[in-house]
Amino acid sequence: MDIQHTFEVYRTQLDNLRRHNSYGRPQVLNQFRMQFKGFSETDIETLKAFLLDDDKKWFVADLLDHLREFPRDLLRPMLYSAVIEPDASFNNEFIKPCRRVFDFAEIQKILLDIFQNGSKDEKIGVLKALYWARPTVYSLQVHSGGKVTEQQGYDVFGWDDELKSYNYDFN
């Protein structure tokens, strides 16, 4: 599927969802996922340009969140979109797909590079993004009878067929 066409269908479907006060993601993302064979160089450049556009960047975050993997060429632009996102509660939309596909150390290295070489606003953005760019360790106490055991685990990402998206869970 063509990226520009997919975006146009996405926007139309998203507008319909909002108009009807429905929650969910546009179905075109699932269709794209089923037909996805990889991105061309043109697709990658288009997605990079979309990440610099305040409206189109959300499409890229949603699209990559639906794919099993995506090229390393999109990692830094995705993280940069998280850094420049003014609302810290939304920058995870760009980081979550990266966490699922790439190593935490690689993500943190890129963010630290942006911090070292960035402007004051970029440095503030990196500090906000680092909140999401870390392995999450969970500790769970299980009470069974008179016995208390503690379990620890990390985030694990898996495709949820019912929700048609990747979700993370405790493992």
What do the PLM-derived regions correspond to, one by one?
Residues L51-K56, D103:
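Glycine-centered secondary-structure boundary/capping sites
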Residues M1-R11, K37-A49, F70-A82, F104-F115, ...:
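Amphipathic alpha-helical scaffolding segments comprising HEAT/armadillo-like alpha-solenoid repeats
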Residues L17-N21, F36, K48-L52, L64, ...:
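Alpha-solenoid helical repeat architecture
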Residues M1-Y23, N91, F115-N171:
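Long, helix-rich interaction regions
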Residues K37, K48, K56-K57, K96, ...:
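Context-gated lysine
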Residues F36-K37, K48-A49, A61-P71, P77-Y80, ...:
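Alpha-solenoid helical repeat scaffolds
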Residues R19-G38, W58-F70, F90-F102, I124-T136:
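Structural detector for internal amphipathic alpha-helices that build alpha-solenoid repeat scaffolds
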